[in-house]
Amino acid sequence: MTKDIHQHRILILDFGSQYTQLIARRVREIGVYCELWAWDVTEEQIREFNPSGIILSGGPESVTEAGSPRAPEYVFNAGVPVFGICYGMQTMAEQLGGKVQSSTEREFGYAQVEVLGQTNALLRSIEDAIAPNGNALLDVWMSHGDKVTAIPADFTTIAQTATCPHAAMACESKHFYGVQFHPEVTHTRQGARMLEHFVKDICGCECLWTPATIIDDAVARIREQVGDDEVILGLSGGVDSSVVAMLVHRAIGDRLTCVFVDNGLLRLNEGEQVMEMFGDHFGLNIIKVEAEERFLSALAGEDEPEAKRKIIGRVFVEVFDDEAKKLKNARWLAQGTIYPDVIESAASKTGKAHVIKSHHNVGGMPAEMKMGLVEPLRELFKDEVRRVGLELGLPYDMLYRHPFPGPGLGVRVLGEVKKEYCDILRRADAVFIEELRKADLYNQVSQAFAVFLPVRSVGVMGDGRKYDWVIALRAVETIDFMTAHWAHLPYDFLGHVSNRIINEINGISRVVYDVSGKPPATIEWE
């Protein structure tokens, strides 16, 4: 009998910090399951979840202001360890009888905290340096304006800085801990060890959450959910749908039918690569639909980016629906929904007024399809999906290649999309990526691609002049894709790529390089 991989679990209450998802990812990396819920969760919901421990996240608000978020009182009466981070520490202190004040000295960025003694379970045996008095020093990342000025009864101060007298506090008898810094960010060098101390040593969680156990659990769940029915999946060749295909195939074999739609907006040879990998190599049952003409006809004359996206989404649903109707026994639709999609959608347990979007991985299936949903990646972050993919035997290069937009080249051909433009762009993009790999630059940038500009520019070829199209190259470096810097690729490299594109691809007279950051520009041009 295999162990329940959700048996030991951490509940993270979200107070609005930009780092909250990072806390969850760090806990998962330790090997323990966790979920992210809104701060105003009910006692009944906490009891039902039955956490081994609770983490209170940071947040942008001030504990000193009326109406600011508070942890449910039950959190401190549930009989499980509690770890407050930044705002989480402040609300813990205030709710348990301590004092929090707004400070004129805002701490933001790197700081060094002094650990006061080594007897507490959270910070024991952790150090980055030693102070002259023999106390451990930790390099941490601060981001706060308020600070705790008096800790609750039964608590002790376990760390301090020159400007923050209570940088960390602990009540060992109840296993309550608070830190004013952010252990989840890499700038806090020993942060992972602090979280590991809390999750494993203090909460007593076993490390049951691994790629191998996630696969076993997903396969068992799929088999239980679909029984003897058949399943259909829209396979794009992207990371999420590829991992779903492998999981569902492992669970039910040939009762999975994958539909791969070649919409004419894919990268060079992508359709052939998908069919070869999943059909020939892994033996999945795949239907390839040649739909280039249908998509390009629908896009003809349209040059507005959002309208193009909607057309591409609508036509995909129509094509997929046509194929699904042919599969009379398909009762289930598999989708590559992942945990961040769930967090962002109204269906999420963190669903509040600030919901960002309603997510449907395939653009929303028609209601008349009346299929049940199979979403085996629903609990996983993107980095976990990739690790599961590696465990399933998918190639590293495929799992870790740069992001590609859902509408494909439809939003990298500016303005109206035509077959001629797509063919030119496909080849230019392939040259750029090939040269990045050859120069060992591909993994040094977060995303790189070519863009087709629908403007003609004069050029010289031999003794004659030519009047052809312009290609823009884009490469960025980013951690979270929310902000990005343009990549400072070597001039010699860019010159070589430009020469290859102009000399090898008919119809291009000029290559330019995009040196815009995000903000103000977005990463994609449309």
Swiss-Prot record:
Keyword Transmembrane helix recorded: no
CDD domains on file: GATase1_GMP_Synthase, GMP_synthase_C
EC number assigned by the record: 6.3.5.2
Residue ranges occupied by any Glutamine amidotransferase type-1 domain in the UniProt entry: 9-208
Protein's UniProt keywords contain Ion transport: no
Top EC class for this record: ligase
InterPro entries: Class_I_gatase-like, GATASE, GMP_synth_C, GMP_synth_GATase, GMP_synthase, GMPS_ATP_PPase_dom, NAD/GMP_synthase, Rossmann-like_a/b/a_fold
UniProt GO cellular component terms: cytosol
UniProt binding sites for ATP: S236, G237, G238, V239, D240, S241, S242
The entry's keywords: ATP-binding, Glutamine amidotransferase, GMP biosynthesis, Ligase, Nucleotide-binding, Purine biosynthesis
Catalytically driven reaction(s): XMP + L-glutamine + ATP + H2O = GMP + L-glutamate + AMP + diphosphate + 2 H(+)
Subunit structure: Homodimer.
Main function: Catalyzes the synthesis of GMP from XMP.
HAMAP family hit by this protein: GMP_synthase
UniProt name for this protein: GMP synthase [glutamine-hydrolyzing]
